[in-house]
């Protein structure tokens, strides 16, 4: 039976640490941390995600600033909104909720966010900081995965890690974080030949491919640690990830569930980035350095 990598429980524990940091720092800072979430259009899933982030902010004591613009918004309007948030002294973190409506390019909008307020860690400068091992906001989902591994005493050093997926959102920063933790890292993608032969070499397997249950027992060596980043709705109802959990449960040493695994940690790391940005701006002491991969 695989060890359950319980992201929901860990997120709750980390929220308590963040709330303590906010309580202890508010007197010196003169205000709580602020997170602004920019949502464009009326995608139902995005609305749910934003509502969950607002609830998490409230639990920790982070002030939430929502900006909801219509899907017909022009890029110039979005850029002006981002520039206003960059200049707003109440805002320490800015998140552009993705995906954007068809016809809008996220690249120039992400580039317009102040790198020090980049709550999602997706600005080009922050990806460069990650590559060089310099301080800065970290991409939330990979940072959440690293926190989950640490919480269970799983040290990537010297291990073979395979990341399935090479997106700038998850796959590429995930590979960099594992490499920084001294793992030997291989990245698989849609052009990889004989995927199973590669993934069976993994001591740590992180799957962020965006395909429901594509990883089965034939892809995993006994005793591997498997982190499932995917989340999908089944046609018959319910949720599943990128791995077939039923097949991997008796095989893996550790497995993250869907839901309740990586998802809650992604939201928590968004708050970590925001609280750390606030702490840096106001030169506050903190004990959150272990959360930054």
UniProtKB/Swiss-Prot annotation:
The keyword Nucleotide-binding does not apply. Keywords: Amino-acid biosynthesis, Histidine biosynthesis, Hydrolase, Methionine biosynthesis, Multifunctional enzyme, NADP, One-carbon metabolism, Oxidoreductase, Purine biosynthesis. GO terms for molecular function: methenyltetrahydrofolate cyclohydrolase activity; methylenetetrahydrofolate dehydrogenase (NADP+) activity. One of its GO terms (cellular component) is cytosol. GO terms for biological process: L-histidine biosynthetic process; methionine biosynthetic process; purine nucleotide biosynthetic process; tetrahydrofolate interconversion. Transmembrane segments: none annotated. It catalyses: (6R)-5,10-methylene-5,6,7,8-tetrahydrofolate + NADP(+) = (6R)-5,10-methenyltetrahydrofolate + NADPH; (6R)-5,10-methenyltetrahydrofolate + H2O = (6R)-10-formyltetrahydrofolate + H(+). This is Bifunctional protein FolD.
């Amino acid at each position: 039976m695989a060890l359950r990598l319980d992201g929901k429980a860990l997120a709750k524990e980390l929220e308590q640490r963040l709330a303590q940091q906010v309580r202890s720092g508010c007197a010196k800072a003169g205000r709580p941390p602020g997170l602004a979430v920019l949502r464009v259009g009326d995608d139902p899933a995005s609305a749910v995600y934003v509502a969950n982030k607002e609830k998490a902010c409230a639990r920790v004591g982070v002030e939430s600033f929502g900006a909801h613009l219509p899907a017909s918004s022009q890029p110039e309007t979005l850029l002006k909104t981002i520039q206003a948030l960059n200049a707003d002294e109440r805002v320490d973190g800015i998140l552009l909720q993705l995906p954007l409506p068809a016809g809008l390019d996220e690249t120039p909008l992400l580039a317009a966010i102040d790198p020090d307020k980049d709550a999602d860690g997706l600005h080009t400068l922050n990806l460069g900081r990650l590559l060089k091992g310099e301080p800065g906001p970290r991409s939330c989902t990979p940072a959440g995965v690293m926190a989950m591994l640490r919480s269970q005493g799983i040290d990537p050093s010297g291990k073979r890690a395979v990341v399935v997926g090479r997106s700038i959102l998850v796959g590429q920063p995930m590979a960099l974080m594992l490499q920084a933790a001294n793992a030997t890292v291989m990245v698989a993608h849609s052009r990889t030949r004989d995927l199973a032969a590669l993934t069976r070499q993994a001591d740590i397997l992180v799957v962020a491919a965006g395909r429901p249950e594509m990883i089965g027992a034939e892809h995993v060596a006994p005793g591997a640690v498997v982190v499932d980043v995917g989340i999908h709705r089944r046609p018959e109802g319910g949720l599943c990830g990128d791995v077939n959990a039923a097949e991997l449960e008796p095989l893996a040493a550790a497995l993250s569930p869907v839901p309740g695994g990586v998802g809650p940690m992604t939201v928590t790391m968004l708050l970590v980035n925001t609280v750390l940005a606030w702490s840096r701006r106001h030169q506050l002491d903190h004990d959150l350095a272990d959360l930054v991969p």
